[in-house]
């Protein structure tokens, strides 16, 4: 068994996800009789080192209370904000007595336990944190309107995945600085980058996909059925 210090896991889950075309947020779409959110949470619930799981939901969320996972004592609900950053900040207000936090996408249900273990090992070598990431193998184009501007060299490009691991005090401080400047970020590691911190990249599996479009459901269903252990 791998030993880790106690951590708290945050799920920003206040988004609406209108691109999926459903009448309810995409985290509540079911795959194998469980919602995407439940699949995303499942890997963390039974971990001894996970002290608490904070789920930031929309104040108009009528679906979460129907989930059976709410009965688990580790699960705590907080009201999220209009943006991902606001939701994470809301959850951080309820974090105490730990040095490390994980932030994981509510609609990333295919996380593999080996990737999680690799990420947590960074606690032993970095005082700041790390993110799971996957190298980009596709050719990447910079656009100018609807035209190609130029091709970007991909040898140093990575796709940021989640979960992302952070020293609690550093994350809180960096988010405070970024929001005070009115800057918009799309993940928490960007806040630390802008504050000058160097985070480790941990090579993660490419099947750790984020559900964004309807076609992603087919991939997630395949991975959950055949790959996830």
From Swiss-Prot:
The record marks 19, 26 as: Transition state stabilizer. Pfam families: IspD (PF01128). It is an enzyme of class 2 (transferase). Pathway: Isoprenoid biosynthesis; isopentenyl diphosphate biosynthesis via DXP pathway; isopentenyl diphosphate from 1-deoxy-D-xylulose 5-phosphate: step 2/6. Its EC number is 2.7.7.60. Gene3D superfamilies: Spore Coat Polysaccharide Biosynthesis Protein SpsA, Chain A. InterPro entries: IspD, IspD/TarI, IspD/TarI_cytidylyltransf_bact, ISPD_synthase_CS, Nucleotide-diphossugar_trans. SUPFAM superfamilies: Nucleotide-diphospho-sugar transferases. GO terms for molecular function: 2-C-methyl-D-erythritol 4-phosphate cytidylyltransferase activity. Keywords: Isoprene biosynthesis, Nucleotidyltransferase, Transferase. The record marks 154, 210 as: Positions MEP for the nucleophilic attack. It catalyses: 2-C-methyl-D-erythritol 4-phosphate + CTP + H(+) = 4-CDP-2-C-methyl-D-erythritol + diphosphate. CDD domains: CDP-ME_synthetase. GO terms for biological process: isopentenyl diphosphate biosynthetic process, methylerythritol 4-phosphate pathway. Homodimer. Catalyzes the formation of 4-diphosphocytidyl-2-C-methyl-D-erythritol from CTP and 2-C-methyl-D-erythritol 4-phosphate (MEP). Belongs to the IspD/TarI cytidylyltransferase family. IspD subfamily. This is 2-C-methyl-D-erythritol 4-phosphate cytidylyltransferase. It comes from Wigglesworthia glossinidia brevipalpis.
């Amino acid at each position: 068994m791998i030993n880790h210090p106690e951590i708290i896991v945050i799920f920003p889950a206040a988004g609406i996800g209108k691109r999926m075309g459903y009448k309810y947020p995409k985290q509540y779409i079911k795959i194998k009789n469980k919602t995407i959110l439940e699949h995303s949470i499942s890997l963390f619930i039974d971990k001894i080192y996970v002290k608490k799981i904070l789920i930031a939901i929309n104040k108009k969320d009528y679906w979460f209370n129907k989930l059976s996972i709410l009965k688990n004592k580790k699960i705590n609900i907080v009201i999220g904000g209009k943006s991902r950053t606001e939701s994470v900040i809301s959850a951080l207000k309820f974090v105490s007595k730990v040095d490390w936090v994980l932030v994981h996408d509510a609609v990333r249900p295919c996380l593999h336990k080996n990737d999680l273990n690799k990420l947590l090992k960074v606690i032993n070598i970095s005082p700041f944190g790390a993110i799971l990431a996957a190298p980009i193998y596709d050719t990447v184009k910079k656009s100018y309107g609807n035209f190609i501007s130029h091709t970007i060299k991909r040898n140093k490009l990575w796709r940021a995945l989640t979960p992302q691991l952070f020293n609690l005090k550093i994350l809180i401080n960096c988010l405070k600085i970024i929001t005070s400047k009115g800057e918009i970020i799309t993940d928490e590691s960007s806040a630390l980058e802008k504050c000058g911190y160097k985070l480790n990249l941990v090579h993660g599996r490419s099947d750790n996909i984020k559900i964004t479009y309807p076609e992603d459901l087919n991939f997630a269903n395949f991975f959950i059925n055949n790959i996830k252990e």
